């Protein structure tokens, strides 16, 4: 056992590796960074926001070697007791985080056609990490596993049965690690009993989703088989009538691939505003009177409020609504507009508390009294992954979850 063990958390995306190093005893972040632009001449590694290091034409293993070298420079290599990997999609095979074995890798590969862009990158990260740290126990944490508690009526689509039975077409949901972390923290902040409570978690960022959590379990969520379904997002359309897309294809001659690009990359806040997918840009334009920016934000808010209210139907009661993610944590305007839309649920906003910056951390923003408590809880997916790794790796756990 290392005297000062740490957990290395790795998140391999389609062209990047985000990583952090957390102290096992406290889960404090000791080091964090990103290797971006994999397999291009512009690839780089940035540690703790410092000057980027050139990694031209590096693949995942090259980038992880560079990260390992930076660990060694900081005398952290021998302290790596566990490695936690974020895996985008676990399909129906993975209902919880697991110790990585050859069999687990084979099963991840089996479900990877459900998320080819991300899962194969995740597998590349696992292969590289196992090669570089052969003696270190590694854990896989799935973005979909928290939602495996959905009932069939919540995850099935109204399609012919064979698409589900033969192809696995169903709602899987995403942002599960974030929803799980935030709901756990909400029980403490709101003084709720995990075994008898109802929460709605709104993870709002460039990607966004809603999750209904009943008695500690996900019972409904807005994203579907892919992250496209549900809320309108930065560049994703969210819910859209398939008939409308078929009509567009007929009228314009666009292919399925063309339309898939449109709804994933050219829609959402960007599509309606014609300006940007960045909410900060749109909020500035809102205050300057830019009509399409205002319309994009109002549509974004309407969809969020509608999904929150709809997801409440999956709960036995509604104790709290929690905002998280880059937008949920930082946008005073979006929280205000969403809560104003949800007056039907008995929500009342504390305007001054809502204006508090995210540096204030976890905070209740609903007025007293309010039928439903509204709060902001910064997400921490890296910590959740580290906690799972610590638990499964049987390393001395932190004193408390917080």
Swiss-Prot record:
Gene3D superfamilies on file: 3.30.420.40
Enzyme class: transferase
Residues where substrate binds: 86
Site label Transition state stabilizer, positions: 175, 236
Names of the cofactor(s): Mg(2+)
Active site positions, chain numbering: 143 (proton donor/acceptor)
Molecular function (Gene Ontology), one example: metal ion binding
Pathway(s) where this gene product acts: Amino-acid degradation; L-threonine degradation via propanoate pathway; propanoate from L-threonine: step 4/4
GO biological process, one term: acetate metabolic process
Pfam families named in the record: Acetate_kinase
Binding site for ATP: 11, 18, 175, 203-207, 278-280, 326-330
Residues given in the record as Mg(2+) binding sites: 11, 381
SUPFAM superfamilies in UniProt: Actin-like ATPase domain (SSF53067)
GO CC field: cytosol
Enzyme Commission code: 2.7.2.15
Catalysed transformations (reactions): propanoate + ATP = propanoyl phosphate + ADP
Keywords: ATP-binding, Kinase, Magnesium, Metal-binding, Nucleotide-binding, Transferase
InterPro entries: Ac/propionate_kinase, Aliphatic_acid_kin_short-chain, Aliphatic_acid_kinase_CS, ATPase_NBD, Propionate_kinase
Alphabetized PANTHER family for the sequence: ACETATE KINASE (PTHR21060), PROPIONATE KINASE (PTHR21060:SF17)
Similarity section: Belongs to the acetokinase family. TdcD subfamily.
Protein role: Catalyzes the conversion of propionyl phosphate and ADP to propionate and ATP. It can also use acetyl phosphate as phosphate group acceptor.
Subunit structure, interactors included: Homodimer.
Protein name according to UniProt: Propionate kinase
Originating organism: Salmonella typhimurium (strain LT2 / SGSC1412 / ATCC 700720)
Name of the coding gene: tdcD
């Amino acid at each position: 056992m290392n005297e000062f063990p740490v957990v290395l958390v790795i998140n391999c995306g389609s062209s990047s590796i985000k990583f952090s190093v957390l102290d096992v005893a406290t889960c404090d972040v000791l080091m964090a960074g990103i290797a971006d632009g994999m397999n291009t001449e512009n690839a780089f590694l940035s540690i703790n926001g410092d000057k980027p290091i050139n990694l031209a034409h590096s693949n995942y293993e090259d980038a992880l070697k560079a990260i390992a070298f930076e660990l060694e420079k900081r005398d952290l290599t021998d302290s790596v007791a566990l490695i936690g990997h974020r895996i985008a999609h676990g399909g129906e095979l993975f209902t919880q985080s697991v110790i990585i074995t050859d069999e687990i890798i084979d099963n991840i590969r089996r479900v990877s056609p459900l998320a080819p862009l991300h899962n194969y990158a995740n597998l590349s990260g696992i292969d590289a990490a196992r090669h570089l740290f052969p003696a270190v126990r590694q854990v896989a944490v799935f973005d979909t596993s928290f939602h495996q508690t959905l009932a069939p009526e919540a995850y099935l689509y109204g399609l012919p049965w064979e698409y589900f039975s033969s192809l696995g077409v169903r709602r899987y949901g995403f942002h599960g690690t974030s929803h799980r972390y935030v709901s756990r923290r909400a029980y403490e902040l709101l003084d709720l009993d995990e075994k008898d409570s109802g929460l709605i978690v709104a993870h709002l960022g460039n990607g966004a989703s809603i999750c209904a959590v009943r008695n500690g379990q996900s019972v409904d969520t807005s994203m579907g088989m892919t992250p496209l379904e549900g809320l309108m997002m930065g560049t994703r359309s969210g819910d859209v009538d398939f008939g409308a897309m078929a009509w567009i294809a007929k009228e314009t001659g666009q292919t399925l691939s063309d339309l898939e690009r449109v709804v994933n990359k050219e829609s959402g806040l960007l599509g309606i505003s014609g300006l940007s997918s960045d909410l900060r840009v749109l909020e500035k334009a809102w205050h300057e009177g830019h009509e399409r920016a205002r319309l994009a934000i109002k549509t974004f808010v309407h969809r969020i409020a509608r999904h929150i209210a709809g997801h409440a139907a999956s709960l036995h009661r509604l104790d709290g609504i929690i905002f998280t993610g880059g937008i949920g944590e930082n946008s005073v305007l979006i929280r205000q507009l969403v809560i104003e839309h949800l007056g039907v649920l008995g929500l009342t906003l504390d305007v001054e508390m809502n204006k508090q910056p995210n540096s204030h951390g976890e905070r209740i923003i609903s007025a007293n009294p309010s039928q439903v408590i509204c709060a902001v809880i910064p997400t921490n997916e890296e910590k959740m992954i580290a906690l799972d790794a610590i638990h499964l790796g049987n390393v001395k756990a932190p004193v408390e979850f917080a």
